[in-house]
Amino acid sequence: MDLIGLLKSQFLCHLVFCYVFIASGLIVNAIQLCTLVIWPINKQLFRKINARLCYCVSSQLVMLLEWWSGTECTIYTDPKACPHYGKENAIVVLNHKFEIDFLCGWSLAERLGILGNSKVLAKKELAYVPIIGWMWYFVEMIFCTRKWEQDRQTVAKSLLHLRDYPEKYLFLIHCEGTRFTEKKHQISMQVAQAKGLPSLKHHLLPRTKGFAITVKCLRDVVPAVYDCTLNFRNNENPTLLGVLNGKKYHADCYVRRIPMEDIPEDEDKCSAWLHKLYQEKDAFQEEYYRTGVFPETPWVPPRRPWSLVNWLFWASLLLYPFFQFLVSMVSSGSSVTLASLVLIFCMASMGVRWMIGVTEIDKGSAYGNIDNKRKQTD
Protein backbone atom coordinates (compact mmCIF):
# COMPACT_ATOMS: atom_id res chain seq x y z
CA MET A 1 0.00 0.00 0.00
CA ASP A 2 1.40 3.42 -0.97
CA LEU A 3 1.58 6.37 1.42
CA ILE A 4 -1.58 8.04 0.09
CA GLY A 5 -3.48 4.77 0.28
CA LEU A 6 -2.30 4.28 3.86
CA LEU A 7 -3.40 7.82 4.74
CA LYS A 8 -6.87 7.23 3.29
CA SER A 9 -7.36 4.18 5.50
CA GLN A 10 -6.58 6.03 8.74
CA PHE A 11 -9.29 6.52 11.36
CA LEU A 12 -8.47 10.23 11.72
CA CYS A 13 -9.39 10.86 8.07
CA HIS A 14 -12.60 8.91 8.53
CA LEU A 15 -13.35 10.92 11.66
CA VAL A 16 -12.98 14.18 9.72
CA PHE A 17 -15.29 13.00 6.94
CA CYS A 18 -17.86 11.66 9.37
CA TYR A 19 -17.82 14.80 11.50
CA VAL A 20 -18.27 17.10 8.49
CA PHE A 21 -21.04 14.90 7.10
CA ILE A 22 -22.95 14.59 10.39
CA ALA A 23 -22.56 18.22 11.46
CA SER A 24 -23.41 19.67 8.04
CA GLY A 25 -26.25 17.16 7.62
CA LEU A 26 -27.87 18.16 10.89
CA ILE A 27 -27.48 21.84 9.98
CA VAL A 28 -29.14 21.17 6.63
CA ASN A 29 -31.96 19.23 8.32
CA ALA A 30 -32.54 22.18 10.67
CA ILE A 31 -32.64 24.63 7.75
CA GLN A 32 -35.04 22.32 5.90
CA LEU A 33 -37.33 22.33 8.91
CA CYS A 34 -37.35 26.13 8.82
CA THR A 35 -38.30 26.14 5.13
CA LEU A 36 -41.64 24.51 5.91
CA VAL A 37 -43.11 27.99 6.39
CA ILE A 38 -42.44 28.65 2.68
CA TRP A 39 -44.53 25.70 1.43
CA PRO A 40 -47.99 27.33 1.89
CA ILE A 41 -46.74 30.57 0.34
CA ASN A 42 -44.66 29.36 -2.60
CA LYS A 43 -44.44 25.60 -3.09
CA GLN A 44 -42.10 25.82 -6.08
CA LEU A 45 -39.63 28.03 -4.21
CA PHE A 46 -39.70 25.55 -1.32
CA ARG A 47 -38.82 22.75 -3.74
CA LYS A 48 -35.95 24.65 -5.34
CA ILE A 49 -34.43 25.60 -1.98
CA ASN A 50 -34.64 22.05 -0.65
CA ALA A 51 -33.12 20.63 -3.84
CA ARG A 52 -30.03 22.79 -3.18
CA LEU A 53 -29.98 21.80 0.49
CA CYS A 54 -30.25 18.14 -0.53
CA TYR A 55 -27.28 18.63 -2.83
CA CYS A 56 -25.21 19.93 0.11
CA VAL A 57 -25.53 16.52 1.77
CA SER A 58 -25.73 13.95 -1.03
CA SER A 59 -22.85 15.51 -2.97
CA GLN A 60 -20.53 14.78 -0.02
CA LEU A 61 -21.00 11.05 -0.65
CA VAL A 62 -20.44 11.61 -4.37
CA MET A 63 -17.24 13.49 -3.46
CA LEU A 64 -16.04 10.44 -1.53
CA LEU A 65 -16.72 8.21 -4.52
CA GLU A 66 -15.29 10.45 -7.25
CA TRP A 67 -12.55 12.46 -5.56
CA TRP A 68 -11.51 10.44 -2.49
CA SER A 69 -11.67 6.88 -3.82
CA GLY A 70 -11.22 7.90 -7.46
CA THR A 71 -13.85 5.43 -8.64
CA GLU A 72 -14.42 5.57 -12.39
CA CYS A 73 -17.80 5.03 -14.04
CA THR A 74 -18.07 4.42 -17.78
CA ILE A 75 -21.46 4.75 -19.46
CA TYR A 76 -22.29 2.57 -22.47
CA THR A 77 -25.10 4.15 -24.46
CA ASP A 78 -26.36 5.20 -27.87
CA PRO A 79 -24.61 8.52 -28.74
CA LYS A 80 -27.93 9.81 -30.10
CA ALA A 81 -29.40 9.59 -26.59
CA CYS A 82 -26.65 11.63 -24.89
CA PRO A 83 -28.17 15.08 -25.65
CA HIS A 84 -31.30 14.06 -23.72
CA TYR A 85 -29.47 13.11 -20.50
CA GLY A 86 -29.86 15.79 -17.84
CA LYS A 87 -32.27 17.76 -20.03
CA GLU A 88 -35.45 15.80 -19.35
CA ASN A 89 -37.37 14.03 -16.59
CA ALA A 90 -36.80 10.28 -16.60
CA ILE A 91 -37.68 7.11 -14.71
CA VAL A 92 -34.51 5.11 -14.01
CA VAL A 93 -34.71 1.32 -13.72
CA LEU A 94 -31.50 0.08 -12.07
CA ASN A 95 -30.44 -3.41 -11.01
CA HIS A 96 -29.94 -3.74 -7.25
CA LYS A 97 -26.96 -6.03 -6.67
CA PHE A 98 -24.16 -3.89 -5.22
CA GLU A 99 -23.78 -1.99 -1.97
CA ILE A 100 -22.91 1.25 -3.76
CA ASP A 101 -25.24 1.01 -6.76
CA PHE A 102 -27.21 3.99 -5.41
CA LEU A 103 -23.97 5.97 -5.13
CA CYS A 104 -23.07 5.24 -8.75
CA GLY A 105 -26.53 6.50 -9.69
CA TRP A 106 -25.89 9.68 -7.69
CA SER A 107 -22.54 10.10 -9.41
CA LEU A 108 -24.21 9.95 -12.81
CA ALA A 109 -26.89 12.41 -11.67
CA GLU A 110 -24.18 14.77 -10.40
CA ARG A 111 -22.32 14.67 -13.72
CA LEU A 112 -25.59 15.42 -15.50
CA GLY A 113 -26.22 18.36 -13.16
CA ILE A 114 -29.42 17.11 -11.50
CA LEU A 115 -28.24 15.41 -8.30
CA GLY A 116 -30.24 17.68 -6.01
CA ASN A 117 -33.45 16.74 -7.82
CA SER A 118 -32.89 12.97 -7.86
CA LYS A 119 -35.87 11.00 -6.53
CA VAL A 120 -36.27 7.38 -5.51
CA LEU A 121 -38.96 4.90 -4.55
CA ALA A 122 -37.55 3.75 -1.20
CA LYS A 123 -38.61 1.55 1.68
CA LYS A 124 -40.29 3.48 4.48
CA GLU A 125 -37.66 2.46 7.05
CA LEU A 126 -35.12 4.70 5.31
CA ALA A 127 -37.20 7.77 6.20
CA TYR A 128 -36.05 7.33 9.81
CA VAL A 129 -32.33 7.18 9.02
CA PRO A 130 -30.82 10.41 10.43
CA ILE A 131 -29.69 13.06 7.95
CA ILE A 132 -30.29 11.15 4.69
CA GLY A 133 -33.79 9.93 5.52
CA TRP A 134 -34.82 13.22 7.11
CA MET A 135 -33.41 15.12 4.13
CA TRP A 136 -35.38 12.93 1.72
CA TYR A 137 -38.64 13.80 3.45
CA PHE A 138 -38.25 17.44 2.45
CA VAL A 139 -37.47 16.69 -1.20
CA GLU A 140 -40.59 14.57 -1.68
CA MET A 141 -39.01 11.16 -1.92
CA ILE A 142 -41.60 8.40 -2.31
CA PHE A 143 -41.63 5.98 0.63
CA CYS A 144 -43.43 2.65 0.52
CA THR A 145 -44.16 -0.13 3.00
CA ARG A 146 -43.74 -2.75 0.22
CA LYS A 147 -47.23 -4.00 1.03
CA TRP A 148 -49.25 -3.26 -2.08
CA GLU A 149 -52.59 -2.99 -0.31
CA GLN A 150 -51.20 -0.08 1.73
CA ASP A 151 -49.02 1.44 -0.98
CA ARG A 152 -51.48 1.56 -3.87
CA GLN A 153 -53.07 4.87 -2.88
CA THR A 154 -50.24 6.50 -0.92
CA VAL A 155 -47.60 5.92 -3.61
CA ALA A 156 -49.92 7.08 -6.39
CA LYS A 157 -50.81 10.23 -4.45
CA SER A 158 -47.13 11.04 -3.83
CA LEU A 159 -46.23 10.43 -7.48
CA LEU A 160 -48.99 12.75 -8.69
CA HIS A 161 -47.44 15.54 -6.60
CA LEU A 162 -44.35 15.32 -8.83
CA ARG A 163 -46.32 16.20 -11.96
CA ASP A 164 -45.83 19.92 -11.36
CA TYR A 165 -42.23 19.68 -10.09
CA PRO A 166 -40.43 22.81 -11.39
CA GLU A 167 -37.05 21.30 -12.38
CA LYS A 168 -35.74 18.27 -14.25
CA TYR A 169 -35.38 15.12 -12.17
CA LEU A 170 -34.48 11.44 -12.30
CA PHE A 171 -36.84 9.05 -10.51
CA LEU A 172 -35.04 5.84 -9.51
CA ILE A 173 -36.90 2.60 -8.97
CA HIS A 174 -35.37 -0.76 -8.06
CA CYS A 175 -38.00 -3.05 -9.57
CA GLU A 176 -36.51 -6.10 -7.86
CA GLY A 177 -37.72 -4.63 -4.57
CA THR A 178 -34.65 -5.65 -2.57
CA ARG A 179 -30.93 -6.17 -3.07
CA PHE A 180 -29.80 -9.33 -4.85
CA THR A 181 -28.48 -12.22 -2.75
CA GLU A 182 -28.13 -15.87 -3.69
CA LYS A 183 -30.78 -16.90 -1.16
CA LYS A 184 -33.28 -14.32 -2.40
CA HIS A 185 -32.48 -15.26 -6.00
CA GLN A 186 -33.21 -18.93 -5.35
CA ILE A 187 -36.58 -18.13 -3.79
CA SER A 188 -37.39 -15.60 -6.51
CA MET A 189 -36.74 -18.12 -9.27
CA GLN A 190 -39.04 -20.61 -7.54
CA VAL A 191 -41.76 -17.97 -7.81
CA ALA A 192 -40.89 -17.38 -11.48
CA GLN A 193 -41.17 -21.11 -12.18
CA ALA A 194 -44.53 -21.29 -10.40
CA LYS A 195 -45.81 -18.38 -12.52
CA GLY A 196 -44.46 -19.79 -15.77
CA LEU A 197 -41.95 -16.97 -16.23
CA PRO A 198 -38.43 -17.41 -17.66
CA SER A 199 -35.66 -17.76 -15.08
CA LEU A 200 -33.18 -14.94 -14.54
CA LYS A 201 -29.55 -15.61 -13.72
CA HIS A 202 -28.37 -12.21 -12.48
CA HIS A 203 -31.58 -10.52 -11.28
CA LEU A 204 -34.53 -11.14 -9.02
CA LEU A 205 -38.02 -11.33 -10.46
CA PRO A 206 -39.15 -7.69 -10.92
CA ARG A 207 -42.08 -6.33 -8.91
CA THR A 208 -44.27 -4.96 -11.68
CA LYS A 209 -46.99 -3.08 -9.79
CA GLY A 210 -44.73 -0.32 -8.48
CA PHE A 211 -43.27 0.27 -11.93
CA ALA A 212 -46.70 0.22 -13.60
CA ILE A 213 -48.18 2.80 -11.24
CA THR A 214 -45.08 5.00 -11.57
CA VAL A 215 -45.40 4.99 -15.36
CA LYS A 216 -49.14 5.62 -15.14
CA CYS A 217 -48.80 8.63 -12.82
CA LEU A 218 -45.82 10.25 -14.55
CA ARG A 219 -46.44 9.32 -18.19
CA ASP A 220 -47.48 12.84 -19.26
CA VAL A 221 -44.49 14.59 -17.65
CA VAL A 222 -41.72 12.00 -18.10
CA PRO A 223 -40.71 11.44 -21.74
CA ALA A 224 -38.46 8.41 -21.23
CA VAL A 225 -37.38 5.47 -19.10
CA TYR A 226 -33.64 4.90 -18.64
CA ASP A 227 -32.87 1.21 -18.36
CA CYS A 228 -29.57 1.05 -16.45
CA THR A 229 -27.60 -2.16 -16.00
CA LEU A 230 -24.63 -1.77 -13.62
CA ASN A 231 -21.62 -4.00 -13.09
CA PHE A 232 -18.01 -3.72 -11.90
CA ARG A 233 -14.84 -4.79 -13.65
CA ASN A 234 -12.75 -7.76 -12.57
CA ASN A 235 -15.55 -9.09 -10.34
CA GLU A 236 -15.01 -6.24 -7.88
CA ASN A 237 -17.25 -6.30 -4.81
CA PRO A 238 -17.59 -2.61 -3.92
CA THR A 239 -18.66 -1.45 -0.46
CA LEU A 240 -19.31 1.94 1.08
CA LEU A 241 -16.67 1.15 3.70
CA GLY A 242 -14.21 0.46 0.87
CA VAL A 243 -15.00 3.86 -0.64
CA LEU A 244 -14.39 5.49 2.75
CA ASN A 245 -11.03 3.70 2.87
CA GLY A 246 -10.16 5.25 -0.49
CA LYS A 247 -10.41 2.05 -2.51
CA LYS A 248 -10.83 2.67 -6.23
CA TYR A 249 -13.47 0.75 -8.16
CA HIS A 250 -14.29 0.62 -11.87
CA ALA A 251 -18.00 0.69 -12.70
CA ASP A 252 -19.58 0.09 -16.09
CA CYS A 253 -23.22 1.00 -16.71
CA TYR A 254 -25.26 0.23 -19.81
CA VAL A 255 -27.95 2.90 -20.28
CA ARG A 256 -30.80 2.57 -22.75
CA ARG A 257 -33.17 5.48 -23.32
CA ILE A 258 -36.64 4.06 -23.95
CA PRO A 259 -39.30 6.58 -25.09
CA MET A 260 -42.40 6.53 -22.90
CA GLU A 261 -44.65 5.90 -25.90
CA ASP A 262 -42.96 2.50 -26.31
CA ILE A 263 -44.27 1.37 -22.92
CA PRO A 264 -47.84 -0.02 -22.87
CA GLU A 265 -50.48 1.90 -20.93
CA ASP A 266 -52.43 -1.21 -19.95
CA GLU A 267 -51.21 -2.50 -16.57
CA ASP A 268 -51.01 -6.16 -17.59
CA LYS A 269 -49.18 -5.33 -20.82
CA CYS A 270 -46.87 -2.99 -18.89
CA SER A 271 -46.06 -5.83 -16.48
CA ALA A 272 -45.28 -8.17 -19.37
CA TRP A 273 -43.10 -5.45 -20.90
CA LEU A 274 -41.12 -5.13 -17.65
CA HIS A 275 -40.54 -8.88 -17.43
CA LYS A 276 -39.21 -8.81 -20.99
CA LEU A 277 -36.96 -5.86 -20.06
CA TYR A 278 -35.42 -7.86 -17.21
CA GLN A 279 -34.81 -10.81 -19.50
CA GLU A 280 -32.88 -8.41 -21.75
CA LYS A 281 -31.00 -6.97 -18.76
CA ASP A 282 -30.06 -10.50 -17.74
CA ALA A 283 -28.69 -11.18 -21.23
CA PHE A 284 -26.65 -7.95 -21.07
CA GLN A 285 -25.17 -9.00 -17.72
CA GLU A 286 -24.32 -12.45 -19.06
CA GLU A 287 -22.56 -10.84 -22.03
CA TYR A 288 -20.67 -8.51 -19.67
CA TYR A 289 -19.39 -11.41 -17.56
CA ARG A 290 -18.29 -13.14 -20.76
CA THR A 291 -16.63 -10.19 -22.57
CA GLY A 292 -16.04 -7.51 -19.90
CA VAL A 293 -17.94 -4.83 -21.85
CA PHE A 294 -21.52 -3.77 -22.54
CA PRO A 295 -22.95 -3.03 -25.99
CA GLU A 296 -22.95 0.48 -27.50
CA THR A 297 -20.37 3.26 -27.31
CA PRO A 298 -18.46 3.97 -24.05
CA TRP A 299 -18.91 7.51 -22.72
CA VAL A 300 -17.50 9.11 -19.58
CA PRO A 301 -19.38 12.29 -18.59
CA PRO A 302 -16.90 14.88 -17.30
CA ARG A 303 -16.44 15.06 -13.54
CA ARG A 304 -17.71 18.37 -12.12
CA PRO A 305 -15.85 20.16 -9.31
CA TRP A 306 -18.91 21.22 -7.31
CA SER A 307 -19.12 18.18 -5.01
CA LEU A 308 -15.52 18.83 -3.94
CA VAL A 309 -16.15 22.58 -3.59
CA ASN A 310 -19.21 21.88 -1.45
CA TRP A 311 -17.24 19.58 0.87
CA LEU A 312 -14.37 22.06 1.19
CA PHE A 313 -16.88 24.77 2.13
CA TRP A 314 -18.38 22.69 4.92
CA ALA A 315 -14.95 21.49 6.07
CA SER A 316 -13.60 25.04 6.32
CA LEU A 317 -16.72 26.12 8.19
CA LEU A 318 -16.82 23.25 10.68
CA LEU A 319 -13.32 21.89 11.25
CA TYR A 320 -11.75 24.96 12.90
CA PRO A 321 -14.26 25.11 15.80
CA PHE A 322 -14.10 21.31 16.01
CA PHE A 323 -10.33 21.27 16.51
CA GLN A 324 -10.59 24.20 18.92
CA PHE A 325 -13.04 22.13 20.92
CA LEU A 326 -10.71 19.09 20.88
CA VAL A 327 -7.73 21.15 22.03
CA SER A 328 -9.69 22.70 24.90
CA MET A 329 -10.98 19.29 25.97
CA VAL A 330 -7.54 17.66 25.92
CA SER A 331 -5.79 20.60 27.58
CA SER A 332 -8.29 20.63 30.43
CA GLY A 333 -6.54 17.58 31.89
CA SER A 334 -9.75 16.33 33.45
CA SER A 335 -10.13 12.56 33.33
CA VAL A 336 -13.92 12.94 33.24
CA THR A 337 -13.66 15.31 30.27
CA LEU A 338 -11.32 12.98 28.39
CA ALA A 339 -13.53 9.98 29.12
CA SER A 340 -16.54 11.93 27.84
CA LEU A 341 -14.62 12.81 24.68
CA VAL A 342 -13.76 9.16 24.06
CA LEU A 343 -17.39 8.21 24.66
CA ILE A 344 -18.57 10.81 22.14
CA PHE A 345 -16.13 9.48 19.53
CA CYS A 346 -17.26 5.91 20.15
CA MET A 347 -20.93 6.83 19.85
CA ALA A 348 -20.28 8.83 16.67
CA SER A 349 -18.30 5.95 15.19
CA MET A 350 -21.07 3.48 16.04
CA GLY A 351 -23.68 5.82 14.53
CA VAL A 352 -21.78 6.15 11.27
CA ARG A 353 -21.13 2.41 11.18
CA TRP A 354 -24.85 1.84 11.61
CA MET A 355 -25.66 4.15 8.68
CA ILE A 356 -23.06 2.35 6.55
CA GLY A 357 -24.59 -0.95 7.64
CA VAL A 358 -27.88 0.07 6.02
CA THR A 359 -26.13 -0.37 2.64
CA GLU A 360 -24.47 -3.71 3.40
CA ILE A 361 -25.76 -6.74 1.52
CA ASP A 362 -25.44 -9.20 4.40
CA LYS A 363 -27.46 -6.86 6.61
CA GLY A 364 -30.14 -6.12 4.05
CA SER A 365 -33.85 -6.62 4.57
CA ALA A 366 -35.48 -10.03 4.63
CA TYR A 367 -38.12 -8.77 2.22
CA GLY A 368 -37.06 -10.98 -0.67
CA ASN A 369 -36.71 -14.01 1.60
CA ILE A 370 -40.07 -13.85 3.33
CA ASP A 371 -42.42 -12.07 0.95
CA ASN A 372 -41.57 -14.26 -2.03
CA LYS A 373 -42.27 -17.38 0.02
CA ARG A 374 -45.67 -15.97 0.96
CA LYS A 375 -46.45 -15.15 -2.68
CA GLN A 376 -45.49 -18.61 -3.80
CA THR A 377 -48.06 -20.15 -1.47
CA ASP A 378 -50.82 -17.65 -2.39
From Swiss-Prot:
Domain remark from Swiss-Prot or TrEMBL: The HXXXXD motif is essential for acyltransferase activity and may constitute the binding site for the phosphate moiety of the glycerol-3-phosphate.
Residues spanning the membrane: 11-31, 125-145, 311-331, 338-358
Pathway(s) per entry: Phospholipid metabolism; CDP-diacylglycerol biosynthesis; CDP-diacylglycerol from sn-glycerol 3-phosphate: step 2/3
Source taxon at top rank: Eukaryota
Cell location: Endoplasmic reticulum membrane
Gene, per the UniProt record: Agpat4
SMART domains for the chain: PlsC
Gene Ontology MF terms: 1-acylglycerol-3-phosphate O-acyltransferase activity; lysophosphatidic acid acyltransferase activity
Reaction(s) this enzyme catalyzes, per UniProt: a 1-acyl-sn-glycero-3-phosphate + an acyl-CoA = a 1,2-diacyl-sn-glycero-3-phosphate + CoA; (4Z,7Z,10Z,13Z,16Z,19Z)-docosahexaenoyl-CoA + 1-hexadecanoyl-sn-glycero-3-phosphate = 1-hexadecanoyl-2-(4Z,7Z,10Z,13Z,16Z,19Z-docosahexaenoyl)-sn-glycero-3-phosphate + CoA; 1-octadecanoyl-sn-glycero-3-phosphate + (9Z,12Z)-octadecadienoyl-CoA = 1-octadecanoyl-2-(9Z,12Z-octadecadienoyl)-sn-glycero-3-phosphate + CoA; 1-octadecanoyl-sn-glycero-3-phosphate + (4Z,7Z,10Z,13Z,16Z,19Z)-docosahexaenoyl-CoA = 1-octadecanoyl-2-(4Z,7Z,10Z,13Z,16Z,19Z-docosahexaenoyl)-sn-glycero-3-phosphate + CoA
Role according to the record: Converts 1-acyl-sn-glycerol-3-phosphate (lysophosphatidic acid or LPA) into 1,2-diacyl-sn-glycerol-3-phosphate (phosphatidic acid or PA) by incorporating an acyl moiety at the sn-2 position of the glycerol backbone. Exhibits high acyl-CoA specificity for polyunsaturated fatty acyl-CoA, especially docosahexaenoyl-CoA (22:6-CoA, DHA-CoA).
The protein, known as: 1-acyl-sn-glycerol-3-phosphate acyltransferase delta
Principal location: endoplasmic reticulum
InterPro entries in alphabetical order: Acyltransf_C (IPR032098), Plipid/glycerol_acylTrfase (IPR002123)
GO cellular component: endoplasmic reticulum; endoplasmic reticulum membrane; mitochondrial outer membrane
The keyword DNA-binding is annotated on this UniProt entry: no
Motif (HXXXXD motif): 96-101
Tissues where the protein occurs: Expressed at a high levels in the brain, at intermediate or low levels in skeletal muscles, gut, kidney, spleen and lung. Barely detectable in heart and liver.
